Structures are given as structure tokens and as C-alpha cells.
Amino acid sequence: VTIKIYPVIEAEWLNWMQREHIPEVLATGYFDRAVFTRLLEPHDEEGLTFSVQYYTSTHHRYKQYIDEEAPKLRQKGFDRFGDRFIAFRSLMETID
């Protein structure tokens, strides 16, 4: 998931992501771990960009999460931060 936020919400949003959102996503049981990163380059004057990579063992588990859990967890972000962020998903596969 790639997320771009307005700088004014950075502290509150980071706290929410680390203490609430990411733990809630992991607590669904569909993902094994998460890696939370900040984009350093290219620098964007309009906002701050972050990424969370959630790892799961099967595509089926990912699809179940999207269908059963994602809408309500995503809504919590909109309820709290409104239009001060944008987020989009990318589905990737690890190549060993």
C-alpha cells in the first residue's frame, strides 16, 4: 500500500499507523508481517509518501482480506483523516 499524506497530519498519522492500523491489519490473521517505510527520493513538495508491505503466504488469503476486512479498516482511515491522504494498493510477488 502506498500512501501520500499532507505534512500537517504526519505525527498523528504515523502514531495511528504504528499503534492502531498496522496492528489491526495483522490481527486479522491474513498477513504474516508488515514492513513500513518512508519514501526519501524523489522528494515531493506536496506531501510525504509512505509504503506498507504486507506479506501473506497465498493469494487466497490476500483476496479474503480484501473482501472481508479491508473495507472497514480503510474506512477508519477516512473517518479519522478525511481527504488529507490518498492511498492505493499494488499486488506484488516475491521472486526468490
Descriptions of predicted regions:
Residues 1-4, 36-68:
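Short, well-ordered beta-strand segments in beta-rich or mixed alpha/beta enzyme
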Residues 7-9, 58-60, 95:
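Residues that cap or initiate secondary-structure elements
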Residues 9-36, 74-75:
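Short amphipathic alpha-helical segments
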Residues 5, 29, 61, 76-83:
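A generic structural signal for ordered secondary structure
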Residues 35-48, 75-96:
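Glycine-rich beta-strand-turn "strand-cap" elements at beta-sheet edges
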Residues 28, 68-69:
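Structured segments of extracytoplasmic/periplasmic soluble domains
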